[in-house]
């Protein structure tokens, strides 16, 4: 069983990318569980065709830890993908990252990881790998990490910060970085920029996902692109990304760059003056 965490700047399309990749792997015959590690509890919405499932933390609050049952917090979605949302604390109370810890520990207690799974995906909130949201890495659940980014400055800034956190854990023998996924924003020289940025981080751009209105069309219909129309060119892109992740055997400890180096890189590729 391979355990994979997806990180990235808020709004970059991380959850969309993760769910489409999960759907692609499911269509290839793999068995998956997706654990949404975001208090918004929207990391599995497309796989569940818009159905909002009860989160682990909401269920714990409603019935208490002794009465929680696995079938109450694990819902089957597209292609048989098992979907879980960790949820979060009540507004203004508690720590969202702590909620991730509680949710994953609850899943383990309930035996969710004993199923015959090929992949577990963790869709993790956070521009920075803070203690709670780093839990899938720190506690040895996620073994490989992919960062979703674009050629925009703040997306690369966040990716670099995430790499700083990954580096700390990787040096202690925890997870490794599997690569960057460029979710295109049609930035000038975007592919070349992200490839060079990845090289400097001691990793690779595992796939360039082109911008497509079909992603939005599928989302309006509350589906992944694979589910909406598996023959679309964008569906092929997600299948290709899934194939590359499945075949990837190059995992590294990242080498983050300085902010000055990042700004110089942006200037080198004509992104900023």
Curated annotation (Swiss-Prot):
UniProt PTM comment: The reversible ADP-ribosylation of Arg-98 inactivates the nitrogenase reductase and regulates nitrogenase activity.
EC code(s) of this entry: 1.18.6.1
Sites where the protein binds ATP: 8-15
Organism for this UniProt entry: Roseiflexus sp. (strain RS-1)
Protein name per the record: Nitrogenase iron protein
UniProt-listed PANTHER family: LIGHT-INDEPENDENT PROTOCHLOROPHYLLIDE REDUCTASE IRON-SULFUR ATP-BINDING PROTEIN
Subunit structure: Homodimer.
UniProt family annotation: Belongs to the NifH/BchL/ChlL family.
Pfam families tied to this protein: Fer4_NifH
Keywords in alphabetical order: 4Fe-4S, ADP-ribosylation, ATP-binding, Iron, Iron-sulfur, Metal-binding, Nitrogen fixation, Nucleotide-binding, Oxidoreductase
One Gene Ontology biological process: nitrogen fixation
Function: The key enzymatic reactions in nitrogen fixation are catalyzed by the nitrogenase complex, which has 2 components: the iron protein and the molybdenum-iron protein.
């Amino acid at each position: 069983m391979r355990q994979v965490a997806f990180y990235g700047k808020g709004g970059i399309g991380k959850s969309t990318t993760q769910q489409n990749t999960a759907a692609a792997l499911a269509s290839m015959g793999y068995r998956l569980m997706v654990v949404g590690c975001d208090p918004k509890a929207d990391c599995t919405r497309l796989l569940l065709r818009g159905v909002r499932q009860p989160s682990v933390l909401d269920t714990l609050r409603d019935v208490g830890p002794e009465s929680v049952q696995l079938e109450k917090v694990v819902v089957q979605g597209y292609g048989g993908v098992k979907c879980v949302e960790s949820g979060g604390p009540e507004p203004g109370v508690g720590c969202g990252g702590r909620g991730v810890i509680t949710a994953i520990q609850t899943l383990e207690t309930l035996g969710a990881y004993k199923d015959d799974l090929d992949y577990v995906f963790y869709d993790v909130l956070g521009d920075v790998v803070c203690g709670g949201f780093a839990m899938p890495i720190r506690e040895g659940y996620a073994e490989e990490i992919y960062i979703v980014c674009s050629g925009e400055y703040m997306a690369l800034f966040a990716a670099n910060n995430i790499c700083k956190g990954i580096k700390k854990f990787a040096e202690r023998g925890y997870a490794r970085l599997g690569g960057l996924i460029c979710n295109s924003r049609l930035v000038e020289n975007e592919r070349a920029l992200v490839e060079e940025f990845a090289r400097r981080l001691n990793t690779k751009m595992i796939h360039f996902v082109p911008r497509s209105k079909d992603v939005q069309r599928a989302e309006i219909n509350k589906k992944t692109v694979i589910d909406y129309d598996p023959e679309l060119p964008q569906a092929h892109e997600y299948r290709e990304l899934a194939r590359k992740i499945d075949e990837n055997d190059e995992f590294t400890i990242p080498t983050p760059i300085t902010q000055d180096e990042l700004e110089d890189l942006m200037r080198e590729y004509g992104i900023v003056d």
